[in-house]
Amino acid sequence: MAAPPEHAATGSEQTDPPETNSEPDLSQPEPADSDADEPVGPKIRETPEDIRLEAIANTVALHPSRDVLVCGDVDGDVYAYAYSCTEGETRELWSSGHHLKSCRQVRFSADGLKLYSVSRDKAVHQLDVERGQLVSRIRGAHAAAINSLLLVDENILATGDDRGTLKVWDMRKGEAFMDLKHHDDYISDIAVDQAKRILLTTSGDGTMGVFNIKRRRFELLSEFQSGDLTSVALMKRGKKVVCGSSEGTVYIFNWNGFGATSDRFAVKAESVDCIVPITDSIMCTASMDGYIRAINLLPNRVIGCIGQHVGEPIEEINKSWDSRFLVSCAHDQLIKFWEISNLQKTTVSDYRKRKKKDGRMKSLTKKALGDNDFFSGLVEETEKKEEEEEEEEDSDSDSD
């Protein structure tokens, strides 16, 4: 950008030569406006830009040590992206079309060098993360479409299918050393304890299954719950197990008390399809209603809304390697990023605050109620005023 006219040199306007006995002009010229001369740099955003896909993504996984994500879609394609908060720098790295039918789940190995995917075509694929090339394939790994996938360790893989069969694989041999069917419907999710000894499965038949990897045997099924159990996660340093359901209820089990629930919590959502632990007490859940909720466990409380895919069912959520972002994919064919670093510092007291009069959730991110920063700012200011008014009312009531 050219310098403004007022900063241009004026020496050419002098017509008379200077006198020989005059003092030299030692004054420094005014510096040019640095803002005017410097090129405008790329915009730095709070979160990476949304990624628009060609088809609905069923699954999204994030690299364990880099700003890279992978998603699998209903066409069977797998895509890898490098994401960045610098505008315009989020880009596709590679794509793979080796699955013949819908890709149901993708997962990185712990070292981030391998990627595993399962599909409705009943196959298990291993891909090279750097190039996206197919390394190995297990055709016909299940008799039915595979729905869920878990990496137990660098060599052990667990898969669950639409008919309720669980298989545990030794990937060094490409063979399953556990092949058990104790569910009457699809296996929706799989989790493992920190000792890598006990596998937990949730199913559309409304039960949670418990399997012992070390002894290679089935242990027990929980009592039946109303509706499908859709997700499972360990909380409270492994002392609690939480299961989401198709009816919007979170069921809570004590560790080693898997037969019956110790507690339950109605989230008032259409469903609780995905659960991602953020801290020992706080988890994020995703629902068919398009909302991502932050929930505190014991005391059981919906803290607020992390974000939403407006009116679109969310398929999966996962957090980034540095726990800065939560990433979601939904039926709007978008992958969205949500800032959650402040959520880790959140504490919930036993005191239950008065519910908002209009029933809406508290927004926990600037994008929670939409991408318009102006209106989201107004929402935040309104919520702060409401909280201050509530605190004043509570203090007045305490003083009476």
UniProtKB/Swiss-Prot annotation:
Protein name (Swiss-Prot/TrEMBL): WD repeat-containing protein 55
Pfam families: WDR55 (PF24796)
Main location class: nucleus
PANTHER family: WD REPEAT-CONTAINING PROTEIN 55 (PTHR44019:SF20)
Highest taxon listed in the record's lineage: Eukaryota
TM stretches of this protein: none
Biased composition (Acidic residues): 386-400
Sequence similarity: Belongs to the WD repeat WDR55 family.
Function per UniProt: Nucleolar protein that acts as a modulator of rRNA synthesis. Plays a central role during organogenesis, including thymus development.
Presence of the UniProt keyword Repeat in the record: yes
One annotated Gene Ontology cellular component of this protein: nucleolus
Compartments reported by the entry: Nucleus, Nucleolus
Phylogenetic placement of the source organism: Eukaryota, Metazoa, Chordata, Craniata, Vertebrata
Feature: compositional bias, Polar residues: 11-25
Tissues where this protein is expressed: Ubiquitously expressed.
Inactivation phenotype: Death between 8 and 10 dpf due to multiple defects in organogenesis. Thymus primordium fails to accumulate lymphoid cells. The head, the eyes, the liver and the gall bladder are smaller. Pharyngeal arches are abnormally shaped and lower jaws are malformed. In contrast, hematopoiesis and development of the gills and the gut, as well as body axis formation, are not disturbed at 7 dpf.
GO annotation terms (biological process): chordate pharynx development; eye development; head development; liver development; rRNA processing; spleen development; thymus development
UniProt-annotated stretches for the region Disordered: 1-44, 356-400
WD repeats: from-to residues: 52-91, 98-137, 141-179, 182-221, 224-263, 266-305, 309-348
